[in-house]
């Protein structure tokens, strides 16, 4: 082992657990095995190929040299930031305090650096996207959770209230990462009643100290309920405009534009014009990655000025939302046929199957060529990469794995 590596950096796994599972699945498939790979976190078509939105790539190919090569401003092109915020809240005239980031992960990382002190903890849902914990650890912070509602059940307001008040009491501030609507990894969104309860709790706790709500938006364009998504965004806008809770958003082009490799997004607080907040975000950018790629920012600006391209993109989003919905319906039907409960997907790329001993169940599934991602609460299943025709195999293999004790 390299002696120069400090002791606290010597015990990490060689690869991210999700990427390691995906690599194992691909290796076994390449070796001739029949593999069902539900670990994938990108949208695949029925042939198992990466979906790349043609409307977006048409704009990409049209970019000029000067839209690609120069440095972008440290905090990002202001017009890009405004255009990205207005994709989510069209009536807003400004991005507020905002900066460009390398994808949504960059936005999450910057929020930790600016809204918590080292040693403090952020709050998020259980279950959550695994790299949340990695981001917290890398910034010297902890992570605590409150429960995401079960299918058909309301938000556990008492548990959320206790978590919020505990953090406020112990550290004097709260940062909540909320992946809603289209929650990763459950594929379900908060109901209007759930949101009302949670926002009420946030308002109450904000009387005791600073509260920041960061909405982690990644999958909003892939939903069977676009009207519900719009209603949720309006509710969060109302909370942000009140000003008692600092409401921001982690925005990304990765899924929405299928520009995973462009690594472009933003951290935006549309209802804040605080110059100190803007200066802090800009400082973090300069001290972390300096600035972000210009090309994807230029692409979004072209999109914002091209109504026909927007129509083509919306049509592609509708199509792939229908594909995901059909996969989710097929999976629910297959689970029911095997005597298990349906999962009631509403949006996003994933669903979560609640199981006892997730690691053990995941291992038994792998032995039969079915790959999932184990979580403390169960198994994350990527319907983004699983064809509807594969769902009966998945359900039957899962039933078999659960029958082993």
What are these regions (language model features)?
Residues 44-49, 184-187, 221-224, 257-260, ...:
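Short catalytic/ligand-binding loop motif for oxyanion handling, primarily in non-cytosolic enzymes
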């Amino acid at each position: 082992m390299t002696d120069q590596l400090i002791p606290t950096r010597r015990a990490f796994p060689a690869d991210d657990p999700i990427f390691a599972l995906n690599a194992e699945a691909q290796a076994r498939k390449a070796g001739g095995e029949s593999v069902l790979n539900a670990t994938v976190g990108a949208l695949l078509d029925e042939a198992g190929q990466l979906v790349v939105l043609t409307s977006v790539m048409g704009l990409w190919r049209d970019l000029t040299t000067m839209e690609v090569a120069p440095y972008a401003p440290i905090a990002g092109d202001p017009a890009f930031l405004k255009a990205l915020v207005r994709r989510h809240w069209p009536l807003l005239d400004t991005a507020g305090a905002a900066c460009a980031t390398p994808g949504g992960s960059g936005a999450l990382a910057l929020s930790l650096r600016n809204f918590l002190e080292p040693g403090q903890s952020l709050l998020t849902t259980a279950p959550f996207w695994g790299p949340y914990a990695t981001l917290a650890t890398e910034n010297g912070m902890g992570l605590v959770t409150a429960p995401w509602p079960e299918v058909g059940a309301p938000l556990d307001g008492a548990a959320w209230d206790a978590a919020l008040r505990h953090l406020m009491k112990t550290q004097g501030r709260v940062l909540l990462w909320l992946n809603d609507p289209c929650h990763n990894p459950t594929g379900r969104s908060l109901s209007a009643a759930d949101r009302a309860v949670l926002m009420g709790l946030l308002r109450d706790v904000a009387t005791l100290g600073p509260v920041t709500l960061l909405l982690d938006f990644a999958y909003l364009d892939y939903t069977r309920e676009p009207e519900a998504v719009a209603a949720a965004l309006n509710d969060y806008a109302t909370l942000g405009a009140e000003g008692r809770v600092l409401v921001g958003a982690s925005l990304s082009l990765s899924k929405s534009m299928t520009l995973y490799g462009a690594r472009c997004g933003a951290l935006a607080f549309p209802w804040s014009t605080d110059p100190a907040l803007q200066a802090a975000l800009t400082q973090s950018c300069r001290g972390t990655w300096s600035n972000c790629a210009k090309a994807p920012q230029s692409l979004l600006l072209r999109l914002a000025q091209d109504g026909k391209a927007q129509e083509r993109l919306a049509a592609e989003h509708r199509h792939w939302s229908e594909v995901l919905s059909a996969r989710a319906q097929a999976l629910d039907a297959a689970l029911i046929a095997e005597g298990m409960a349906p999962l009631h997907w509403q949006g996003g790329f994933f669903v979560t199957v609640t199981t006892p001993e997730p690691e053990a169940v995941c291992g038994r599934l792998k032995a039969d060529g079915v790959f999932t991602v184990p979580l403390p609460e169960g198994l994350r299943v990527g319907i983004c990469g699983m064809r509807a025709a594969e769902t009966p195999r998945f359900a039957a293999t899962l039933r078999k794995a659960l029958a082993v004790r």
